A protein has these predicted regions:
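Short, charged, surface-exposed hinge/linker loops at domain edges
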Residues: 1-26, 32, 52, 56-112
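A short, exposed loop/beta-hairpin motif centered on an aromatic-Gly-Thr core
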Residues: 40-53
Length: 112
């Protein structure tokens, strides 16, 4: 299974995060690859490769980046294309790329 998903907004802690540009996500077998505007890319393994499982993993990851975590404990989940890149630094760069792409954050119970 291989497909490209485009994410324009996502829910995080009851808030809808709207993006300026959609994020491209390549799903191939059990790996979800996130690609930033700078073409930085990293993959996350998904044990539940159903559509629902993949969707949950994507939303969890975007929410995680949005909230600003770049903890070393999470690095085991990330597989980097460039093994020479400092994973903590790259996670921070990815987070900054996501944050610079946020257009608005609206409580989910408000009508937009």
């Amino acid at each position: 299974m291989e497909k490209i998903l485009k994410v324009k907004s996502f829910l995080c802690d009851g808030k809808r995060v709207n993006l300026i540009e959609p994020i491209s996500i390549l799903v191939k077998n059990n790996i979800v690859n996130f690609v930033t505007a700078e073409n930085s890319e990293y993959g996350v393994y998904v044990s539940d490769a159903t559509e629902e499982g993949i969707k949950k993993k994507i939303i969890a990851r975007l929410c995680y980046l949005y909230k600003g975590f770049a903890e070393v404990t999470d690095i085991s989940l990330l597989m980097f294309l460039d093994s020479y890149t400092d994973p903590v630094l790259l996670t921070g760069m990815l987070r900054n790329a996501w944050l610079s792409n946020i257009e608005s954050v609206v409580p989910e119970n408000e009508k937009s």
